[in-house]
Amino acid sequence: ADNHARVAGPRAVASGRYATEKAFLQMMTRGSCGLPCHENRRCGWACYCDDGICKPLRV
């Protein structure tokens, strides 16, 4: 198992995992718009990389 999980305890791990998933979901939607982007860091599906900044796609 993971050493960090044993140290933090199951409740902390669960809340940490929830926060990570929530952040990931925000990143995958419009949450990533406005963030810097480059070749290795792409924007979420609702955004595109324009001049180094994630901008919302016009639908």
Curated annotation (Swiss-Prot):
Alphabetical UniProt keywords: Disulfide bond, Neurotoxin, Secreted, Toxin
Domain notes: The cysteine framework is IX (C-C-C-C-C-C).
Transmembrane segments: none
Record's protein name: Crassipeptide cce9a
Note, other: Negative results: has no activity on N-methyl-D-aspartate (NMDA) receptors.
Gene Ontology cellular component annotations, sorted alphabetically: extracellular region
Residues excised as propeptide: 1-30
Keyword Transmembrane attached: no
Organism expressing this protein natively: Crassispira cerithina (Sea snail)
